Amino acid sequence: MKALASLMIIAGISIACTSTGTERKGSVPVGVSDTIAAKAPADKGKQAPAASMISDRRAKGGTLNLAFVGDIMPGTTFPDSRLPEKDGATLFKDVDSILTAADVAAGNMEGALADEGETTKKGGKFSYSFRVPTRYGKLIADAGFDFMSMANNHAFDFGLDGVKSTEATLHSNGIAYSGIGGRKESAIVERNGIRYGFCAFGHNSYTLKHADQENVKRIIGNLREKADIVIVSFHGGAEGTAHKHLPQGKEMFLGENRGDLRNFAHFCIDNGADVVYGHGPHVVRAVELYKNHFIAYSLGNFCTPYGVNISGISGYAPVLQLTVNAADGTFVGGKINSFIQQRGKGPRRDPLNLVAKEIRSLTNADFSNPKLTIANDGTISKR
């Protein structure tokens, strides 16, 4: 997945905190690092990274190819074993060619990567608690993922020990991560001379909260000073098929404030983010072009073969491909690749492109003047 440490040394790459693993996505060595805290810009202004950090590729222009998915929970051993066929060996067989072809690919780790421990949730074994075997970290890496959000309502299913196990597993497989309050607030992934800055926000007490605008602005500002492209992930919104439409204002669910997601996404872009992608409702939602930057409000359930409802539209599992300008992160084009989950098997091709058509329908319904056109095959273009 990532270049071996020796190759990184030969290439002369010096990164603060490096993850290594098998190499992929071309022959260029890559690095994953913590983001060092820095002063946030006073306001948006799309502040450029420091001159010493601007890559030649960005300075020369060109485009970048990004891939995004929703929730990933490949299988659980709690309270009993519910694991996919062939121990997950074929989970990503229909999607890995898209993910590995992207410059970077990102998703949401919906659960703890851990081999032991008891849930800390009320209800014990009767709660929705997901304990994914740590060996599945390699499957996720081999599928092509570079970053995982941990800012969700299942990251703490097995307490701090589960969080630490998840972080260690992702790190050992060369996958960057962020999203838990008081721990790693952002990450930088370098690919082919481009620095991608990632951060993740949620609504739970232990996450970096999307309701804390001052902190959101600070974190994005820090990344803006160090990265060529800034990508924000969020977990939020009410859950279930009754909540597939994107409302105005705050969303309340199970007594929790799940966020004012339109306002949050716009705030992120206003303060320097290039792309914003979401997950949490367990269904897909609309997409938006805001100030020429792309927002996906929910990419639904991507790989949740057990433990999560995947019937009907709950099983819609898009892989969103975006092409953005390297110079400023603005939208060039994209595609919604349609997949539908199969119980115990993972995402499989949707020959009717029902997923793309659903996102198109939601986009046209939830925005009075959408600035995007989505074709039957999922191709996304500006109006």
Describe the predicted segments one by one:
Residues 1-5:
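Bacterial N-terminal signal peptides that target proteins for export
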Residues 6-14:
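Bacterial N-terminal signal peptides
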Residues 18-383:
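Acidic, metal/ion-coordinating pockets
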